[in-house]
Swiss-Prot record:
Record protein name field: Short-chain dehydrogenase/reductase pkfC
One biological process term in Gene Ontology: cellular response to farnesol
Binding residue positions for NADP(+): K56, N108, K140, Y193, K197
Native source species: Emericella nidulans (strain FGSC A4 / ATCC 38163 / CBS 112.46 / NRRL 194 / M139) (Aspergillus nidulans)
InterPro entries associated with the record: NAD(P)-bd_dom_sf (IPR036291), SDR_fam (IPR002347)
Keyword Transcription: no
EC number, UniProt record: 1.1.1.-
UniProt pathway annotation: Secondary metabolite biosynthesis
Amino acid sequence: MVFGSRPPALTEANIGDQSGKVFIVTGATSGYGLLLSTYLYQNNGTVYLAARNAKKTAEVIADLKQRFPASRGRLDSISLNLSDLSTIKKSAEEFLAKETRLHVLWNNAGVMFPPAGSTTSQGYELQLGTNNVGPHLFTKLLYPTLAATAKEAPKNTVRVVWVSSDAASWAPKPAIDFNNLDYRRNESDRSKYGRSKAGTVMQAVELARRARKDGSGIVSIALDPGIANTGLQRDMGRLMSTMVKLIANKPEIGAYTQLFAGLSPEITAEVAEKEWVVPPGKIGCPRRDLFTDTETSRKWWEWNEEQVKAYL
């Protein structure tokens, strides 16, 4: 989705003082995640950069501290590999050993069009495992802390933000094929990626429903950051990469969209069950079955629960 004439609702210039708030951004060392982390830190937020490469994360933190010496925020790192479920509990514990509050979790990390046959450590197709199963486990492990924070924070301000894509519309109907989650019957690259991003939306919506029912006060919202030339496209072919460059927004637009999803007062629990966020930061209409097919969402959530239970 290409950004038109409407200016972003929230930017680094107007999100206000984030002092006292604790955030986690996954995939925080490049692309949208890096920009988002930058905006939060320069406005005095405590930001945990969750990423795989510890050396790169340390370099990013050092750079941000040098660029924004006046920030009263704090930066820290979490080693996070979403493609290996056996490591994710340790990642969550790394955070929980330091913090008792968490205001917003941005599930931003993901993969797109990896080499054919790529799988996670547990054997899931790489996009399914990294974009869906891994974030499910990480979110589940942090959920009690989010819920505890929501009891003290203003209503609708504690959130889980799930970064999907307009590519969710590429998923065939029904969006989740429970008889082919191992892809023993091969599908196109477009279909596999689309299903993973449709799955992200359905995880967000199902968590929103469950959070309302359990009274936790957590808002769970999905978003489409738009098209930008970020590190996510590193495994695309040359033709696709060229097309992306021709139609892409600046990466800042995707980061502003994420700011809106995580911080805008327009986002409420009621909105999150019915709509998602689109560039450059506004409530938009997604593919409707991803929100209305409650039976598939429930089964999808329960399938993910089954996959992660051995790693809690």
